[in-house]
Amino acid sequence: MLVAQSLSANLVFATFIAIGIGSRCAAVVPERIAALIEELGSDEFDRREAAAQELEKVGESVLRQLRTAALESKDFEVRFHAEQLIFEVLRAAGVSTSTDMIFAVIERGEFSMGTPEDQYPRQNNQTPHPVRITRSFLLGTHEVTQKQYEHVMKVNPSGFAEARSGNKQSPDPVADKVEGMETTAFPVEQISWYDAIAFCNQLSNDEGLVPSYTMETITREGHSITNAAVTSLETNGYRLPTEAEWEFACRAGTVTPFNYGEPTNGSMANLKGDNSYASTQEGFYVGHTVKVGSYKPNARGLWNMHGNVSEWCWDWYGPYDDGPLDDPRGPAEGRQRVQRGGAWLVTEQNCCSSSRLGVAPGERKNHAGFRVARSP
């Protein structure tokens, strides 16, 4: 049985804190930050604004103290403005410095995870339960593309890659579906869970961030990692979202089966729309992945949360825990990792906001990819 641990990285802070690491923050003493945060409660507008502007310029290194103030300050104005600043600092941090990735700020909040008792379709592994996401985070607005993956990992394993198509001597029935198309902006697929973990670490290293994972006893098949001992660390690096974070971000405040409302005929997402769903008429079926950013985003500015490729999450797959939960991370051990969102080759009922799938972490398919999260 595979086991992965979750540990808290013991980061040592010098007199001049630099939580952001690299060029993402300015060095400012904690006492100065504390004084500026107190100024957020000033009765004078100019003093509040000056403090807010200085804090925002410092960048990620203010987030730890801002989060404490937003939760614990006895001054309502300090709590209010600290929460606003957290959003602004995260928004400024929501751009990859080495790729063209853009990230949306997913503000902390509460939601009902799973499928409501009276909603169709509902499966036994989707029991509704209250969940609280206690810390705002960043999530990629799009799935990782073939171009981005190749830039970081120096290889493109995708089946739906135009470069693999059109070989008359050795036809590729998968790649030939996208012959003549520009596929660099299609989502990367044929990715194991371990490959996604390795990508997150490499991207963190490329940008001077602290990697979110350790990987030991690695087993490879060609360019892909099929097994490894993985430990999760609490750092500022890139990572996979948890299953709860993924659904919270996908729903964007909705309680309907899809973040765009009730079922449609395949016109709102890249999925198998040629099978009727509930009262929906049969619709179109593309039959392969499509460019990220196709269709409409949800209210949080996230594209393709339904369909296209199913997305790896951090968690081991298993039954939900009972009762309210804060920042759940899934079972402590297991044999399968969670994929979310459904894909181009499955019907709508498998692409709902609450749809979940357990897949062996070493498995690679042309309908599975991932998107990246980060917690500065």
Name each model feature, range by range.
Residues 30-38, 61-70:
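Amphipathic alpha-helical scaffolding segments comprising HEAT/armadillo-like alpha-solenoid repeats
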Residues 40-46, 71-77:
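Short coil turns that connect the paired helices of HEAT/ARM alpha-solenoid repeats
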Residues 49-60, 80-89:
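Structural detector for internal amphipathic alpha-helices that build alpha-solenoid repeat scaffolds
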Residues 96-165, 189-205, 244, 249, ...:
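A short glycine-rich, aromatic-capped structural motif
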Residues 112, 116-118, 182, 187, ...:
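Functional-site microenvironments in short loops/helix caps that host divalent-cation chemistry
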